[in-house]
Curated annotation (Swiss-Prot):
GO biological process, one term: response to retinoic acid
Designated gene of the protein: Ovca2
Catalytic activity: a carboxylic ester + H2O = an alcohol + a carboxylate + H(+)
Coiled-coil spans in chain: none
Full protein name: Esterase OVCA2
One Pfam family this sequence matches: FSH1
InterPro entries hit by this protein: AB_hydrolase_fold, FSH-like_dom, LovG
A single GO molecular function term of this UniProt record: hydrolase activity
Organism: Mus musculus (Mouse)
Amino acid sequence: MAARQTLRVLCLAGFRQSERGFREKTGALRKTLRGRAELVCLSGPHPVPEAAAPEGSCPDSGPCSPEEQPRGWWFSEEEADVFSALEESTVCRGLQEALETVARALDTLGPFDGLLGFSQGAALAAYVCALGQAGDPRFPLPRFIILVSGFCPRGLKEPILQSPMSLPSLHVFGDTDRVIPSQESMQLASRFLGAVTLTHSGGHFIPAAASQRQAYLKFLDQFAE
């Protein structure tokens, strides 16, 4: 019997998450998937001002190290470094730099079997795969995608996510998520053919308790042979 393949997954952080902080936030999931998947974390290219960052993002009053600097993938206002997933916007300022960051990671850190995104990172992961499905050579389609607290990105000039996505997908979201309400994640899931959903009773985080473990493993095991 052939040894089980360890899947490599590029994980895109949420808005206002540092690379180190995102690694810590995915620690429970990393433990759950030990031996099944290697998670490679990536944060956005744009520093988020300290005034807009969560309290306690940096360990002291000095400047953040690159790994501790809260970052984002794009901003939803032209003049301010802020982001709202729920407000209608005509702006995705910094999105091209975000796409370049992901393309560079795929090229230099890959190959990867799948993509995982959390919150704003989930919206970006879905957009990246839509671009890949449309033929963008920077983004070869992965074998699967996992979207946690995802949403359809607003402000895109092209309605690329209107086309059904044929990529195998797992959509994870909380019933009491106040940052990204569950209906936003369900709307994103509806853009994927044969989408698998995993719901939990909590809020805005990546669940990895024993009750969710089997759902992750069942989804990933189909790609491990």
